[in-house]
Amino acid sequence: LMVGGHYTYAEVPLFDTIKELFNLERNNYDKVGHFVQGFVPAIIAREILIRKNVVNAGINSKAWLNVFVISICLAFSAFYELLEWWVAIASGENAEAFLGTQGYVWDTQSDMGVALLGAICAITFLDKIHDKQLSKLRP
């Protein structure tokens, strides 16, 4: 993600090459960042909710845990998008460069959608591994 901070998310060279190779309209490096923005907080939120026993063991506890984790990730993503918007308003003329929308009117919504995908992937692919690691910590 620091690479995007160095070049700006819309101008990361590797993703410019990918854009040219696949004849894409935009540099999609920011989507990688937003995927991670959903993936990493999902595991953190899941662990906190489990360790703090927020969702009690029961018939639908795993489903509710997943709902809460995804909701937390989407709230985090929405807050980040609002923060981007506020910084863009405050900075004025360089708002387009900061936001990296590249003329895509649905950029904010797609960023949140990719964060949602990241959260779902984390829950789907890491829940069993995460549960096994957490069980080793319990006495």
Regions found by a protein language model. Name each.
Residues 1-39, 43:
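"…centered on the first transmembrane helix and the immediately adjacent amphipathic helix/loop
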Residues 1-4, 42-46, 72-84:
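Alpha-helical transmembrane segments of multi-pass membrane proteins
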Residues 12-19, 29, 74-116:
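Interfacial helix-loop-helix junctions of multi-pass membrane proteins
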Residues 127-137:
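Membrane-interface capping segments at transmembrane-helix boundaries
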Residues 54-74:
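Internal alpha-helical transmembrane segments of multi-pass membrane proteins
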Residues 36-53, 89-92, 112-129:
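Membrane-interfacial alpha-helical segments at the cytosolic side of multi-pass membrane proteins
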Residues 23, 54-58, 82, 92:
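Glycine-centered secondary-structure boundary/capping sites
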